[in-house]
Amino acid sequence: MRVVLLGPPGAGKGTQAQKLAEKLGIPQISTGELFRKNIQDGTKLGIEAKRYLDAGDLVPSDLTNQLVDDRLDQPDTAAGFILDGYPRSVEQAKALHEMLRRRDTDIDAVLEFRVSQDELLQRLKGRGRADDTDEVILNRMKVYRDETAPLLEFYDTEVKTVDAIGTLDEVFARALQALGK
């Protein structure tokens, strides 16, 4: 099963992606984690990505697309994957579609985790990430609204909305139900 998770920063995509990947026996592909690892390792891509992430901006699509394309070449993705944090724009969604077309496959499901803005601010301030300052949080929410929300229109009929308020297990149960599992 090939699944895309959508939702604003702090909606719980990463946590739910881990649980879904475990339950479905497929890898979680998190561009955020891949960027953080590259930043920590001081790679050229990591240094370049850090400049954008520190400002609360999205890493340019060409860098992100290459990272995802390379990851999809790994054998553990053959049976499927959970994409967490990608695609973030219609341009990236089209690139993903092309990557999958080259592999004779497609996305099976798109889950949108929905949370109110007040709840998101509370969650993000409580995570303790160095990059989660008020200014960066508000900019990331604006970037999400401006650039990522149009994905809901792009994926249209494939999108299943998941209410992301509640316990981890409650949200997980809703996500599984949305996937028909």
Swiss-Prot record:
Lineage, uppermost ranks: Bacteria, Bacillati, Actinomycetota, Actinomycetes, Mycobacteriales
E.C. number(s) listed in UniProt: 2.7.4.3
Chain intervals for the UniProt region annotation (LID): 126-132
PROSITE patterns: ADENYLATE_KINASE
BP-aspect Gene Ontology terms: AMP salvage
A molecular function GO annotation: ATP binding
Binding locations of AMP: T31, R36, D57, L58, V59, G85, Y86, P87, R88, Q92, R129, R140
Chain positions recorded as ATP binding sites: G10, A11, G12, K13, G14, T15, R127, G166
Family statement drawn from the similarity comment of this UniProt entry: Belongs to the adenylate kinase family.
Pathway(s) where this gene product acts: Purine metabolism; AMP biosynthesis via salvage pathway; AMP from ADP: step 1/1
Catalytic activity: AMP + ATP = 2 ADP
Name recorded for this polypeptide: Adenylate kinase
Compartments in which it is found: Cytoplasm
